[in-house]
Amino acid sequence: MKSAKYLLPMAMSSKVTEVVCDAANKSAIRRNEAMKDAKEKGFDEEDYENLEEEFESEEELMTNFVDTCGYILKMHKSDFLPLFDAYPAPVFIPLLQPHNPTTLRHNAMCIFIDVIEHCGTGAHKYLDMMLPAAMQYATDSESYMRQAAVYGLRIASEQAQTQFSQYVMPVLGILATLVQAEDSHNADNACATENAVAAIGTICKFHGDAIHVLHQMLPLWMANLPLQEDEECAQMTATHLCEFLQTRTHMLLGAQFEHASIAVSAMTQILVGCNGGGEDSIELATPQTKQNMQSLLAQMATSLPSDAKNAAWQALNGAQKHVLQSVLPHGVQFMA
């Protein structure tokens, strides 16, 4: 996507942000007061359902407020941080607390992810608040809250590596539990799960030397590839797979190459070109990554032990076998 040619002047951005945040604060107050009133009146389940329907316009309004702040933030990046400190932060810090409705916590999480991702190291002062919240909400009952939380953990692991380092192991534990849940790949949970898989890969990439269970985390991560719901996550994880095969070979494939079949299956699925989970197909890897995969598969055809190659070959379906053989040099067979 090309950068916008028009940049909203900072003075105007300041005024817009002030007005938007004031309106967001009033919207949050209206919702919390309504929830408090409902609790005092002893609303039953049906009453709360009706109240939630009444909140739909407030939820849409708040989403628009958050999007507006996000657009302005991404325009000005680190220059926006003083405005963020003055207007969005005082409004959204309280909304990140557990007693708030999930939609408000989600709004707050999204805006703090944006500032950490786009406003430079000066924004990292919010990590001490945001990271514990993200870890807590990664297990939320609502999948959209989990998805935002694990995305935030991924962004923090890459953008704020020093501060994130103390959270590496507990975060990996949370993500592994999420990914391995029995219902993790059903339709309602797929996006949150794939974001968790992407987060595991990113953490292993940037913090691998500090992970004493890397030999367990990488195969778990790889077993959930390819990702198919979100193109950005799919392409990123495909790139990470190639990088790990080159730099963490034995950690990924196992000391006896016991995980080689998982790697071959993931790469051939990507090369076959699986469709995404939505209405439109997504590109699971960039052209360069696909080229790298073809080279890696050709190398594996000549370097893997025969038993590992045979096991990998037997695990493939017809389309995967066809694409695998098509990328090998003339005369080279993958099956020994």
Where are these regions (language model features)?
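Karyopherin-beta/Importin-beta family HEAT-repeat alpha-solenoid scaffold
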Residues: 1-336
